[in-house]
Swiss-Prot record:
Major location (coarse): nucleus
Sorted UniProt keywords: mRNA transport, Nucleus, RNA-binding, Transport
Species in which this protein is naturally found: Xenopus tropicalis (Western clawed frog)
Motif (UAP56-binding motif): 11-29
Family: Belongs to the UIF family.
Entry's localization field: Nucleus, Nucleoplasm; Nucleus speckle
GO cellular component terms, semicolon-separated: nuclear speck; nucleoplasm
Disordered as annotated region, ranges: 213-238
Tagged with keyword Cytoplasm: no
Name of the molecule in the record: UAP56-interacting factor
Coiled coil: none
Function: Required for mRNA export from the nucleus to the cytoplasm. Acts as an adapter that uses the ddx39b/uap56-nfx1 pathway to ensure efficient mRNA export and delivering to the nuclear pore.
GO molecular function terms listed in the Swiss-Prot or TrEMBL record: mRNA binding
Nucleotide-binding recorded as keyword: no
Length: 289
């Protein structure tokens, strides 16, 4: 497309021209400059797929970085410490993790045992129990088994609530674990005796105290109450302090007990008391009859 030629010669002085002609001439010069920029190839106007217009830089004097093989940094790129922090976020999203009901299913338990067998040492059957405990404390699978135990315990809270309910009412609660279920999982078999069973096949035994039965010394020792806490014990030397204040001039009990006297009777008694006091002190006025 050839540039438009002006109807007015360029050599004509703009002072002698009319205002409308000057405006037309300026517009034509502006259009001519835009066409020159297009032919140079510095900018190219395009329309993208979502219907917006934009300017695309194709070639020209301004693209020195691209000609030298350098890449311009895009806006919003994470670098340095922020990039390291973003890399630590990689992993399984909480939205993609299976729920506890699926996680504790038999299929998940089998995969967990396979993972345990892969992480065992080669001479696993020769070691003693103490060395096995030290091995599992040092191994990285110890944290995984702890998380598995916590999830497994959350699924078995009904027996725990029932045992707590009965123990608060003075009933002794004892849980029996099926130890044959956890022979290949030493972490699950190392549950302390004071905790409730986390196995699905646990038996709950409740024993009620019988006063007619013969009590032994061992059972009496287990039923003894705990010593009181030091912050709950009352000190012997502490005495009740008398509160500081203004002492009352009257007995409030005597005022409160005068409920059988009416107001007229009370005023009559007070009037008689005033008259009696006036006669004892003597009258200032003399009545002449």
């Amino acid at each position: 497309m050839a540039p438009l030629k002006t109807s007015v010669p360029d050599t004509m002085d703009k002072i002698d021209m009319l205002l409308d002609d000057i405006i037309k001439l300026n517009k034509q010069e502006q259009n001519r400059n835009q066409l020159k920029g297009r032919y140079n190839g510095s900018f190219r106007q395009f329309r993208n797929s979502w219907g917006r217009w934009g300017a695309q830089r194709t070639s020209g004097a301004g693209n020195t970085l691209r000609s030298q093989g350098l890449k311009k940094r895009t806006y919003g790129v994470k670098t340095g410490l922020a990039m390291r922090k973003m890399a630590s976020w990689k992993g399984t999203s909480p939205l993609n993790r299976p729920p506890l009901s699926v996680r504790n299913s038999p299929g998940q338990l089998v995969s967990f045992r396979k993972r345990m067998n892969l992480q065992r040492s080669p001479d696993f059957g020769v070691k003693t129990s103490s060395s096995l405990q030290r091995y599992y404390l040092r191994s990285s699978s110890y944290a995984q088994t702890n998380t598995f135990r916590s999830g497994f315990r959350m699924d078995q809270q009904r027996e725990t609530r029932q045992a707590t309910f009965l123990s608060r009412r003075g009933l002794k609660v004892q849980t029996l674990m099926d130890m044959d279920q956890h022979l290949d999982l030493p972490e699950l078999s190392r549950t302390p005796p004071w905790r409730t069973s986390v196995s699905s096949g646990g038996t709950l035994t409740v024993s009620i105290d019988n006063p007619s039965a013969v009590t032994s010394s061992s059972s009496l020792g287990s039923r003894l109450p705990r010593p009181p806490f030091p912050f709950l014990t009352k000190k012997e030397g502490s005495e009740t302090k008398v509160p500081k204040g203004v002492p009352l001039e009257f007995d409030i009990n005597s005022v409160a007990k005068q409920t059988g006297i009416t107001l007229n009777e009370r005023f009559k008694i007070l009037k008689e008391q005033r008259l009696a006091q006036a006669f004892t002190k003597g009258n200032r006025f003399v009545t002449v009859g």
